[in-house]
A protein has these predicted regions:
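All-alpha prenyltransferase/terpene-synthase fold signal
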Residues: 1-259
Length: 259
């Protein structure tokens, strides 16, 4: 519960930085009320998360707070990278992967490791369940990038092309810049240098370039690769097959989600 409260705090602040209108199909806190309310609500949720953490059995408090602090700092670092990348002309796939590992994947990794610590798992299993969380978390964010451009906004819960409007460097953008040639590359540069172009024009034009450069297919393959890495980590965990099946099911749901 502490991790979920912390996660929702990050979403409140993330929506402010992205100036997002919708979250899970509903108006964001800063849009419904204002930025100050959203900031203070997020701050309070951080404190509440720690209050929940210390209710754990005393023998586990120190190690789980260490894990919690590590991924909390990572999430903040990842968000800063995300904001920095918006003003950078080029971002490599390696830089982007590092950013989403920090911003998204470390949260899932840490949540699973906290559960393993409380379950008194051996160190090797704590490591492997963390690797599972990291890789499935990266796959989750890559899937999020796809859904932003290609998902149904009524199902996804966000406006289509929000990342495109904000000039965010997603895996689709990075691959498109690598693959595009001629007029497509020139148009892509122009689209990502403006913040004033009407979204109704910009979004479909950029998605057309994504289609022309086959980045959707490349991203789907990349997601599949991280999914397979996650499954490999599950196999290394020394627990009963029925318990592994729970993790496999979670991974499969993430892979097939549309929201």
């Amino acid at each position: 519960l502490a991790v979920e409260v912390f996660h929702n705090f990050t979403l409140l602040h993330d929506d402010i930085m992205d100036n997002a209108d919708l979250r899970r199909g509903k108006e964001t806190v800063h849009k419904k009320w204002n930025n100050n309310v959203a900031i203070l609500s997020g701050d309070a949720m951080t404190i509440l998360a720690y209050k929940l953490l210390v209710k754990t059995d005393k023998q586990f408090i120190a190690p789980i707070i260490d894990v919690f602090n590590e991924f909390s700092i990572g999430v903040c670092e990842g968000q800063q990278y995300d904001m920095d990348y918006e003003s950078m002309k080029y971002v490599t796939q390696e830089e982007y992967t590092k950013m989403i590992e920090l911003k998204t994947a470390v949260l899932l990794k840490g949540a699973l490791q906290i559960g393993a610590i409380i379950g008194e798992a051996r160190d090797s299993d704590i490591h492997e369940i963390g690797e599972f969380g990291k890789n499935i978390g990266i796959a989750f964010q890559l899937q999020d990038d796809l859904l932003d451009a290609y998902g149904d906004s009524t199902v996804f819960g966000k406006k289509q092309g929000g990342d495109i409007v904000a000039n965010k460097k997603t895996i689709l953008t990075i691959k498109a810049f690598n693959n595009a040639k001629g007029s497509n590359l020139e148009d892509l540069h122009n689209f990502y240098q403006t913040t004033t172009l009407d979204a109704a024009i910009k979004v479909p034009e950029v998605i057309k370039i994504f289609d022309d450069t086959k980045v959707k297919e490349e991203t789907e393959l990349l997601i599949s690769n991280y999914y397979m890495k996650a499954l490999e980590s599950i196999e290394k965990i020394e627990v009963s097959p029925s318990r592994k099946e729970v993790l496999s099911t979670i991974a499969q749901r993430i892979m097939t989600r549309n929201s």
